[in-house]
Amino acid sequence: MSGSSSQFSPGKLVPGAINFASGEIVMNEGREAKVISIKNTGDRPIQVGSHFHLFEVNSALVFFDEKGNEDKERKVAYGRRFDIPSGTAIRFEPGDKKEVSIIDLAGTREVWGVNGLVNGKLKK
């Protein structure tokens, strides 16, 4: 091959290329978010994925409602997940307390497996 002709010229897609739409991508548009706090009281890091049912996470994570009151029954977390991009996670080091945004699980609102606390359709 010589000179300026290349199979990888500007404007052509190449293997692995990502072609984004113009404008902004809005995540979870129209979904009501709540901001709560979560603290890791354990002695190991805990990482929670984007679509994990928060009600069923590791028991070393302590939840605080929007007013900062400890929520021992995890009512604030029932039927909710983190308001973060799909495939990402939030990591809590031992002793970490973080403010996080949470939203309702969508779709059929069924939770199966995890810690076996729901195993079916969510009640609310």
Curated annotation (Swiss-Prot):
Source domain of life: Bacteria
Disulfide pattern: none
Gene3D superfamilies attached to this UniProt entry: Urease, beta subunit (2.10.150.10)
EC number(s) given by UniProt: 3.5.1.5
Chief location category: cytoplasm
Annotated catalysed reactions: urea + 2 H2O + H(+) = hydrogencarbonate + 2 NH4(+)
Location in the cell: Cytoplasm
Molecular-function annotations in GO: urease activity
Keyword Endoplasmic reticulum: no
Pathway in which this enzyme or protein is active: Nitrogen metabolism; urea degradation; CO(2) and NH(3) from urea (urease route): step 1/1
UniProt keyword Hydrolase present: yes
Family per similarity comment: Belongs to the urease beta subunit family.
Subunit structure: Heterotrimer of UreA (gamma), UreB (beta) and UreC (alpha) subunits. Three heterotrimers associate to form the active enzyme.
NCBIfam families for this protein: PRK13203.1, urease_beta
Name by which UniProt lists this protein: Urease subunit beta
Naturally occurring in which organism (per UniProt): Ureaplasma parvum serovar 3 (strain ATCC 700970)
